[in-house]
Amino acid sequence: AMSPEDVRRHMEKAGIYLFTSDRQEGWGAVLNEAMNSGCAVVAGDAAGATPFLVQDGANGSVYHSGDVQELYEKVRRLLDDPSTQRAFGSAAYRTITGLWNAETAAERFLQLSQALLDGRDATKLFADGPCSPASLLREDWYRK
């Protein structure tokens, strides 16, 4: 097994991370790790974290899980266009460090807990990011 430091080092060298998990993955914290390492991610739409972390064409690419041709096209685009690869990697890093970080999660958890203890409606506290409402997603949430 690799140490967390070794994993991080490999991700930072990789440039691109393929997140091909399906609905059995749950959240898939490795996506957070890859984005925090500055990888341009290509993520399947069926994994739990994808709709919350990856904005297709802005901070990564999303493909329909199981569509190998679409996965190939998204990866090929990043390989053929290093500037887009770098831009996605930088935007992914900013997504994690700017919003989906431990400090924000801890602060929001405390605010959420206090709201619940006070009997207030906590569903409107945060529009996105940690502790925001996560409604059920339809299987076809991602459209090309």
What are these regions (language model features)?
Residues 5-8, 26, 47-53, 69:
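Short glycine/proline-enriched, acidic/aromatic patches that form the donor-sugar handling elements
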Residues 56-57, 61-68, 77-82:
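Conserved acidic donor-binding segment of nucleotide-sugar-dependent glycosyltransferases
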Residues 98, 103-144:
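C-terminal amphipathic helix plus adjacent low-complexity
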Residues 12-26, 39:
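Acidic donor-binding loop of glycosyltransferase active sites
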Residues 8, 31-36, 50-52, 58:
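Short alpha-helical segment that forms part of, or immediately flanks, the ligand-binding pocket
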Residues 40-44:
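Short hydrophobic beta-strand element within catalytic cores of glycosyltransferases
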Residues 1-11, 22, 66:
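Conserved active-site histidine-acidic residue motif and adjacent donor-binding/catalytic loop
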Residues 70, 77, 84-98, 105-111, ...:
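A short, well-ordered alpha-helix in the C-terminal region of glycosyltransferases
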